[in-house]
């Protein structure tokens, strides 16, 4: 099983970073490997999200159930995709009204050895650069505001 654990301090409110991660539909705008994304609200709260990977000739998709704790965390659990196991959590810890710590943990395992060899390197790159991509997106959004 592969594991990724990242944390970063950012000069943005926890609620703003939560919203950025929660807006799955916006992922194709700033994640270069994301070929598409769609999310539907679930009656019990949270979302079901599908993310399409299209990166260096590798195409795959996965669907997750995301449980949201408004402004604080998003727990991601595999529903469908090329994984035997995928579980992740985003945490947004307020440090002040305008700063927070973002923590991201992900554990995943592909269903077959062949998928691990083909999709594994791409997904490893994605998982290890995920947090940085969201920080860059937050910087771009806040730089554009007057």
Q: What residue ranges belong to the model's regions?
A:
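A short, structured loop/turn motif at beta-sheet edges
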Residues: 14, 41-45, 68-71, 91-101
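Hydrophobic ligand-binding cavity/cleft-lining segments
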Residues: 1-44, 144
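Glycine-rich portal/gate segments that line the openings of hydrophobic small-molecule binding cavities
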Residues: 38-80, 133, 137
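Hydrophobic/aromatic beta-strand elements that line small-molecule binding cavities or substrate pockets
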Residues: 6-8, 37-39, 62-67, 87-94
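Beta-strand elements of well-folded, non-transmembrane domains
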Residues: 10-14, 53-57, 68-70, 82-84, ...
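Beta-strand/loop substructures that line and gate deep hydrophobic ligand-binding cavities in soluble
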Residues: 78-129
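Hydrophobic pocket/interface hotspot
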Residues: 17-21, 27, 49, 102-104, ...
């Amino acid at each position: 099983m592969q594991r990724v654990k990242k944390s970063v301090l950012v000069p943005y409110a926890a609620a703003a970073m939560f919203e950025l991660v929660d807006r799955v539909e916006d992922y194709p705008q700033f994640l270069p490997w994301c070929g598409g994304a769609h999310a539907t609200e679930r009656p019990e709260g949270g979302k079901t999200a599908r993310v399409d990977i299209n990166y260096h000739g590798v195409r795959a998709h996965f669907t997750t159930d995301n449980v949201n704790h408004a402004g604080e965390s998003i727990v991601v659990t595999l529903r469908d995709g090329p994984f035997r196991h995928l579980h992740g959590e985003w945490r947004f810890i307020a440090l002040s009204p305008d700063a927070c710590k973002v923590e991201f943990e992900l554990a995943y395992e592909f269903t077959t050895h062949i998928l691990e060899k083909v999709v594994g390197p791409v997904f490893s790159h994605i998982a290890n650069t995920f947090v940085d991509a969201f920080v860059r997106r937050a910087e771009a959004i806040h730089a554009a505001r007057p």
